Amino acid sequence: MRGVIVPIVTPFKEDYSIDVPALEEHLDYLQKVGVHGIFINATTGEFTSLSKEERRFLAEKGRELVTSAFYLVGTASSNTLEVIELTKHAQDIGADYAVIAPPYYCPLTEEALFRHYSMIAEKTDIPIILYNIPACANSLSVPLVKRLTIEYPSIAGIKATLDSVNYIRDIILDVKGERKDFRVFTGLDQHFLNTLILGGDGGIMACANFAPELHLRLYKAFNEKRFEEAFEYSRKLAKLSKVYDIASSFGSAIKLAMRVRGFSIKPVLRPPYTMDGKEVEEKVRALLLEVL
C-alpha cells in the first residue's frame, strides 16, 4: 500500500445520528477521483465520540462500499481488550489494515505500550498500521516501533502525525531500513512531499477529504520525476494546511472546508466538539479560494 490515503470524516445529521447517505456519497466520490486508500473510524472521523456498536457499523458499511481502494479501519481504544475485539472485527469483515493509535488519557511506560501492541498482534492476523499522534495519545518512540516490527511481522507500517521531519527520517532509516516492507506514512499534509523524498510511502491526510486532487497530483508528479510540479503542489498543501490554524479544531476545519467546496456533508460535530461559526467559515473560504 502506497500513495494517498484519506482518513474520512463521519457525517452526522443535525440530531447527531450517522448520516449514511452522505457517507455513501463521500466514499463514492473519493473512489472516483482515485485515492489509493480509505481509512474509517479515524481521528478525523471523531472515533472517540462513537460507540463501539457505531464503530462496528461504520466499519462494516465502509467494507461494503469501498471496492477500488485499500480499506483501513481504526480500532484504537485505551482498553486493550476492546482493541483486540475491534481489530478481530476488522479482520473478520475483510479490512486490509487495522490502524491502531496508542492508549490515551493515562501515561504509559514503553514496556506497557509494547505489551499493549504485543497482545493485539498475538491475538489477530490482520496487518497493523501503528499510529503515532503524541498530541492526543502516548507517544511511540523509534526504538519501540523498531522492537515491535522486529518481533511481529503483522505490524506493517506507521502513520506519524507529528511535526517532525527527524522522526520520519529515523523511522525510515532505522525501521524501514531493517524491514523493507514496512510502510511509512505522514499524517500531515504539509509533510507529504518530505516523506516521499526521504523514502516513505505516502500520507494519510485529512485535507484529502476536500481537496484530494492536490495530493494525487503531487504523488503522480513525484513518481514521474516532475519535481518542479511536485514542489508547486507541496507549497499549495503547505498553505492549505493553515486551515487548521483558522479553526478551533481539526474537525471543524475539515467540515467547514467541505461545506465551502460544496460537499453535502453537514457541518456537524458530535459533542463535546463544537463547530466554528460564520466568521471562521469565511476565513476558510478565503484560504481555499487562494489555494485552489
Swiss-Prot record:
GO terms for cellular component: cytoplasm. Keywords: Cytoplasm, Lyase, Schiff base. The active site is at residues 43, 105, 131, 159. Its EC number is 4.-.-.-. It is found in: Cytoplasm. GO terms for biological process: small molecule metabolic process. Belongs to the DapA family. This is Uncharacterized DapA-like lyase TK1237.
